Every structure is written in C-alpha cells, then in structure tokens.
Amino acid sequence: MSALDPAVASRLKRNADGLFTAVVQERATGQVLMVAWMDDDALARTLETREATYFSRSRGEQWVKGLTSGHTQRVHSVRLDCDGDTVLLEVDQVGGACHTGDHTCFDADLLLGPDL
C-alpha cells in the first residue's frame, strides 16, 4: 500500500491521536450511514482500493468495512470538508452499515422528529 499523498496529508487536521472524522453517506439515497475515525493510512488505503477503511479506537487498529461481516462499502467519492478535519465518503452499501445490523447507525433513537 502506498502512503497518503503529501498534498492531501498537509490539508488534514487531526486530533491528538492523529485521527480525523469520516462521515459515510449512501450514494443511492443520500442517507448518512455512520460516522467513524480514520488515520492517514486508513485514508490512503481507502483512496487506493475504494474499500472503506477506518481506524478502531477501541482496538487500536485499522479495519476494512465488511471484511468479516460481508457488509461492505464500495467508495464512490471522498471529499474533504472546509476545515480539513472531516472527510465525507460516498459509498455503495451492501448490507447493514451499523454493527447492530441496522442499515444505518442512526435508525434506533429518534430524539426529535419532523415538525408537521
């Protein structure tokens, strides 16, 4: 695997642990599926392979979405936000995006519904 392009790396703002936020959106629906963490290596792997790769803070290692579950994310595009501290991955989701098996990590707890 190649390293992250220095031109991209220089634009990223990371936290004290060297991580930044990744927001994952489904290409077909525009629905936000999940929020995860990435490090430079995870982003480099994602850009190189188009397989969504994240960094697990609890395990202290990278993980490729769907490698064990089969619930994969094929990356269509990656965008950097205006502050440089968040990337947006637009993906084609196969199966549930959430570790609970739900389609999104935001299916379970509606705190405020639409004002009808």
From Swiss-Prot:
Cofactor note: Binds 1 Mg(2+) ion per subunit. Binds 1 zinc ion per subunit.
Entry binding sites for Zn(2+): 82, 98, 105
Gene Ontology molecular function: magnesium ion binding; phosphoribosyl-AMP cyclohydrolase activity; zinc ion binding
Gene Ontology CC: cytoplasm
Domain of life, per lineage: Bacteria
Cofactor: Mg(2+); Zn(2+)
Protein's UniProt keywords contain Magnesium: yes
Pathway where this protein functions: Amino-acid biosynthesis; L-histidine biosynthesis; L-histidine from 5-phospho-alpha-D-ribose 1-diphosphate: step 3/9
Any GO BP: L-histidine biosynthetic process
Quaternary structure annotation from Swiss-Prot or TrEMBL: Homodimer.
Xref: HAMAP family: HisI (MF_01021)
Function of the protein: Catalyzes the hydrolysis of the adenine ring of phosphoribosyl-AMP.
Protein name (database record): Phosphoribosyl-AMP cyclohydrolase
Native organism: Mycolicibacterium vanbaalenii (strain DSM 7251 / JCM 13017 / BCRC 16820 / KCTC 9966 / NRRL B-24157 / PYR-1) (Mycobacterium vanbaalenii)
